[in-house]
């Protein structure tokens, strides 16, 4: 495999359609797909051509515009009804990622508040989607820049372990957890990245390592069950992960395996941080028990590539996410700074969310 170094732009609005990096093809092939309808966007989200909570939020915003553009009525009320029907389809694609719901509600709010013709509402929806896209890029850079300040001061160059892919591919182009790592690398604070392979879809192996290679960031790939051993050997100084949904009390849903990582981090006195934009906090739910956990195709468990790895008689269970209790999280890194999980309420009070 020969890599060409490139800036990672997972989502691009181009004239009248969206261009996505097909993340199911990485790292073997760099391929883009053009999305011209809301149905195509729904499939892209469901099949993980695009994935990662912030990236899903940006993508669904554009998807809502594509759906708005496809409506065939000039009646405002009928248009809004059809737009809500499109929203229902998108809500069913990835139930755990709260950014998806956040972006949909923001689009619907703009559509309902915009006076004028259907065409003017469509234009307002597109401008909002573009704004969500740009805001996410700026937000992730702010998360990274602010978070570097609270990373452990010793050693001077840190080895940071991350899980799954919370990088440019999972956002508008900078990353949450990997955005923190990018900022640490820029500031000379990073020794190397340790990337969990992240079974069953291997986003750490396929996507996080690929991103690091694009920017010449030193990265070592380990299997998920090596994390505790690496910590005991003194190879890991901090853990930074992303999030798909954070409850009001700080309980955090992230890629399956994060909970285990949090337990072994605490056992070895290694800080574990969650890096996420405020849009990932769901104040409608009090704790992690209320977070819906997506279950995916069992083929992800029993098949690697085209090869089946176990007998056909075996049963399978494939939750895509787990919930890490707030007490196992050292801090939540946001665009407004890092706070303890129990301090999230201040953001709602300040109406930042």
Curated annotation (Swiss-Prot):
Q: Does the keyword Transcription apply?
A: no
What keywords are annotated for this sequence in UniProt?
Amino-acid biosynthesis, Isomerase, Methionine biosynthesis
Instruction: Report the top EC class in one word.
Output: isomerase
**Belongs to which family?**
Belongs to the eIF-2B alpha/beta/delta subunits family. MtnA subfamily.
Summary of the function given for this chain in its UniProt record: Catalyzes the interconversion of methylthioribose-1-phosphate (MTR-1-P) into methylthioribulose-1-phosphate (MTRu-1-P).
Q: Could you tell me the EC number(s) of this protein? A: 5.3.1.23
Q: Which GO terms describe its biological process?
A: L-methionine salvage from methylthioadenosine
What domain of life? Bacteria
Q: Where does substrate bind?
A: 51-53, 94, 203, 254-255
Please report the name of this protein according to its UniProt entry.
Methylthioribose-1-phosphate isomerase
Would I find Ribonucleoprotein among this entry's keywords?
no
Q: Where is this site: Transition state stabilizer?
A: 164
- What does UniProt list as catalytic? 244
Q: Do you know which HAMAP family this protein is assigned to?
A: Salvage_MtnA (MF_01678)
Q: Which reaction does it catalyse?
A: 5-(methylsulfanyl)-alpha-D-ribose 1-phosphate = 5-(methylsulfanyl)-D-ribulose 1-phosphate
* Gene3D superfamilies, alphabetized: translation initiation factor eif-2b, domain 1 (1.20.120.420), Translation initiation factor eif-2b, domain 2 (3.40.50.10470)
- Which pathway does UniProt place it in? Amino-acid biosynthesis; L-methionine biosynthesis via salvage pathway; L-methionine from S-methyl-5-thio-alpha-D-ribose 1-phosphate: step 1/6
């Amino acid at each position: 495999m020969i890599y060409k170094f490139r800036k990672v732009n997972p989502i691009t609005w181009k004239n009248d359609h969206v261009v996505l990096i097909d993340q199911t093809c990485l790292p073997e092939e760099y391929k883009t797909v053009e999305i011209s309808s809301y149905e195509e966007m729904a499939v892209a989200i469901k099949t993980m051509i695009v994935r990662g909570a912030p990236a899903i939020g940006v993508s669904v915003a554009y998807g809502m515009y594509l759906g708005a553009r496809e409506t065939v009525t000039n009646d405002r009320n009928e248009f809004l009804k059809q737009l809500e029907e499109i929203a229902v389809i998108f809500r069913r694609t990835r139930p755990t990622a709260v950014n998806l719901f956040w972006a949909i509600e923001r689009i619907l709010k703009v559509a309902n508040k915009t006076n004028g013709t259907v065409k003017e509402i469509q234009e307002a929806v597109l401008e909002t989607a573009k704004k969500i896209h740009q805001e996410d890029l700026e937000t992730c850079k702010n998360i990274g820049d602010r978070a570097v300040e609270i990373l452990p001061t010793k050693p001077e160059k840190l080895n940071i372990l991350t899980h799954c892919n919370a990088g440019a591919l999972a956002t508008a182009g900078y990353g949450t957890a990997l955005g923190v790592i990018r900022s640490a690398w820029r500031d000379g604070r990073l020794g190397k990245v340790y990337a969990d392979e992240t079974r069953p879809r291997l986003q750490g192996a396929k996507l996080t390592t690929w991103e690091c290679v694009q920017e010449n960031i030193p990265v070592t790939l380990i299997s998920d069950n090596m994390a505790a051993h690496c910590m005991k050997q003194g190879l890991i100084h901090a853990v930074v992960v992303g999030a798909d949904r954070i409850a009001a009390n700080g309980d955090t849903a992230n890629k399956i395996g994060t909970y285990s990582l949090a337990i072994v981090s605490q056992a070895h006195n290694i800080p574990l941080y969650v890096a996420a934009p405020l849009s990932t906090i769901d104040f409608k739910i009090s704790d992690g028990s209320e977070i819906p956990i997506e279950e995916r195709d069992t083929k992800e468990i029993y098949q690697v590539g085209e090869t089946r790895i176990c007998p056909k008689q075996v049963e399978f269970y494939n939750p895509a996410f787990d919930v890490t209790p707030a007490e196992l999280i050292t801090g939540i890194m946001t665009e407004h700074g890092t706070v303890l999980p129990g301090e999230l309420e201040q953001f709602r009070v300040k109406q930042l969310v």
